[in-house]
Amino acid sequence: MSLCCDLQINLNNQFTFFVNQDLISEYSGFLRKMIKQSNKKKKNHKNSRIIIEVEDFPGGSDGFDLVLRFCYGGGISIDVSNVSILHCSSVFLEMTEKLCSSNLLLRTEKFLEGMFYWSWNDIVLCLKSCEQVFLHADSYGLVDKLVFGVLAKIPQNSDVSHVFSSSSPSSSASASASSQSPETAMIRSYSDKRSTSRSFSCRTSNEWWFDDMSILGPKIIEKLINTLGAHDKNNDSLVLTKFLLHYLKTKVPNKSTNKLEYSGLADTAVQGVVFAAKTAFSCRKMFWVLRVLSGFSISKESRIGLERVIGEMLDQATLDDLLIPAGGKGEKGVYDVDLVIRLLKVFVRIGNTEEGDQNLRMRRIGKLIDKYLREISPDQNLKVSKFLEVAESLPDSARDWFDGLYRAINIYLESHPKLSSEDRTKLCRCLNYKKLTLDTCKQLAKNPKIPPNIAVQALKSQQLSNETRPHSREDKNKVNKIWNSRKYLEEKPILVCLKGFDMSEKFEDDLMMNLERKQWNNSEKVSKEKKSEVMSRSVRHGHTHSSSSFPRLC
């Protein structure tokens, strides 16, 4: 051999290896072909070193180094951590039995044949190593083999027939039977034999594998989903949906995360949530799902479906559920107010088509939205139009009283002191003055931030409503005493200064004092008349000096 290293291999335009061409040709059919082609081009330079370019080699320099060690007889140990790289490298380099016996490809295939005897951790580790050479491993069928191995291992430790079938077993069994591969049919059959009537809510029996599988990349998980035939709209498995939610929770998007890689998994999770939402997920859980999945660029269709389910049960939400931080795409404000508006529209639309306890649900959501408005009012980026859009999303029947909404308006006015008079007037249009309690109406009238015309309008509405609907026994007494003295007001008009409405308390006190004085005079007059009548009766009967015959007047 004239040159020990007469072959230069430039690998993936990054690494260079110097090897003996005769030795490497004994094991690799791919390199043998390239060497022959290079020799034909260099007939006049027989003693010169041959240079060949190898691109898109799986495993990079580490993988090629393992191959060279095998060819040079250095001995390599095939295990679950390197078998995927060695298998893909041997297929790429065509290291078959045609060249030499017990070549590298045959050895990796024999090792993979024992996959169904591997431990659970070994299969997961091998799948993880496939991520380095995923495109090659997938095209060579290695990923499919490992996925089938994982799916066969899961039922050995849990009853997860629902992973491989619909949440309602009869819904799609016949439809999917014809499209099953032999491996999938075997896994389904194996899991069906082990299925029992145990509950699937137990984390220890059905979800023990969630954390282990969460170390895998999105491409591997998508392969698993596709193998089960549950991709996107075909997902009707509750356990699989829970796994996807758990998986995506551990992959919270950040600067180094490609959201598009997970968008398909997020859409599949949404379909599973929508399919089993009302029976498997509470309202709070649904908001958690929305928070998790919104960061992965889910499709418009998936978002609409998810918001529809949440909107239908919105009356079960709490204030914390609604306080979802605003997104970063040009959305101003602390909280995602547009989301709440969309959910309210769904709730109201569904409420108009349902009967029964819808009025109770509507009043419950009315109280919740008033609390929500009070919470978001201090936000300096919250526009008046957006505040009104939230407040006016509900009909008047959703609020027995508008006191809570007035308090939200007051907080907004205090937090936005530079608001114009026009905007302050506009802000108050969502109030139903007839549904304000007497105390709240008095507060509104004295509030210097409320435009005077609004205060007058509220007081007029309060007069009309109080005549027909007093709020309490104490208010009823006040209302009767005040409005029964209108004749007195007509006879003695009073100048009213609207500025600041500081006259309201003094006006009521004067009114009450005059009314009590008139009532006392009337009572004293009646007492004197009765006393004189009794005295005249006593004189006629000759008992003028007997005080015992006088009746009690009070």
Swiss-Prot record:
<dbReference type="Pfam" id="PF00651">
    <property type="entry name" value="BTB"/>
</dbReference>
<dbReference type="InterPro" id="IPR011333">
    <property type="entry name" value="SKP1/BTB/POZ_sf"/>
</dbReference>
<comment type="function">
    <text>May act as a substrate-specific adapter of an E3 ubiquitin-protein ligase complex (CUL3-RBX1-BTB) which mediates the ubiquitination and subsequent proteasomal degradation of target proteins.</text>
</comment>
<feature type="domain" description="NPH3">
    <location>
        <begin position="207"/>
        <end position="465"/>
    </location>
</feature>
<keyword id="KW-0833">Ubl conjugation pathway</keyword>
<feature type="compositionally biased region" description="Polar residues">
    <location>
        <begin position="545"/>
        <end position="554"/>
    </location>
</feature>
<comment type="pathway">
    <text>Protein modification; protein ubiquitination.</text>
</comment>
<protein>
    <recommendedName>
        <fullName>BTB/POZ domain-containing protein At3g19850</fullName>
    </recommendedName>
</protein>
<dbReference type="InterPro" id="IPR027356">
    <property type="entry name" value="NPH3_dom"/>
</dbReference>
<dbReference type="InterPro" id="IPR043454">
    <property type="entry name" value="NPH3/RPT2-like"/>
</dbReference>
<feature type="region of interest" description="Disordered">
    <location>
        <begin position="522"/>
        <end position="554"/>
    </location>
</feature>
<comment type="similarity">
    <text>Belongs to the NPH3 family.</text>
</comment>
<feature type="domain" description="BTB">
    <location>
        <begin position="5"/>
        <end position="80"/>
    </location>
</feature>
<dbReference type="GO" id="GO:0016567">
    <property type="term" value="P:protein ubiquitination"/>
</dbReference>
<dbReference type="InterPro" id="IPR000210">
    <property type="entry name" value="BTB/POZ_dom"/>
</dbReference>
<dbReference type="Pfam" id="PF03000">
    <property type="entry name" value="NPH3"/>
</dbReference>
<feature type="compositionally biased region" description="Basic and acidic residues">
    <location>
        <begin position="522"/>
        <end position="534"/>
    </location>
</feature>
